[in-house]
Amino acid sequence: MKDILTAPFVKEMCDTTANMYRLGWDERNGGNISYLLDENEVAEYLDLNNVIRTIPTGFDAPELIGKIFIVTGTGKYFKNVKNDPENNLGIIRIAKDGTTAELLWGYADGGKFTSELPAHLMSHRARLKVDPENRVVMHSHPTNTLAMNYVHELDEKKLTHTLWEMCTECIVVFPDGVGVLPWMLCGTNEIGEATAEKMKEFRLVIWGMHGIYGAGKTMDETFGLIETVEKAAQIYMLTCNMPRVNTIKDSEMQQLAEYFGVNYRKDFLNL
């Protein structure tokens, strides 16, 4: 059996968490990632019959029974993941009862998955119905995206439109726009359910005055979605107090979307 620490999915988690910490998106123990894995690939590294312990998930997910995820741990600092993955990450499988996680590897210090696991699993469930290839759900606190929450209306159309205006690539990268939730208590099933509802329509969901959720087929795609929003938010924050001389017109955004063949939110443009 291969060494689990050499598995591509473990390396991806280590590299991505380190990068997110480096960028200042995930201070202290902020942020979390869950990654849906292929059972056959995991079996190359772990005995799938060896369940270390079971942990209640806090909600029922019958659609995800048997699914295997690698998930960041609760209270864990992203800066420590790369040097100590076995304590900071865990590989779990949703048990047959749909409400329990079977720990197959990790959380070696007795810890468990992120407190936001309900929001992650509910989002996976929602995105898989829209896109069966969805694999990653990522939550972080990008500085400029969060700052923008305090000075811009938290309206999906208006916020998306502003972000699209900031960089030529934005309407191409996230043509489906950005969903928005008001401030809600984190770590609860309620915010998980609200996020999952938005995930039926958007791959990106702003948690008001808190951070952002992203979902995608790969780690790179998901990271890139959040990265692009953060760049747009940075440009907005750098320019919002200055006179606007130039902008990308709605007709030009439409040109971009149609040239690159993306399915964009036409109702978010003022044409």
Language-model regions: role of each:
Residues 1-271:
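Glycine-rich flexible loops
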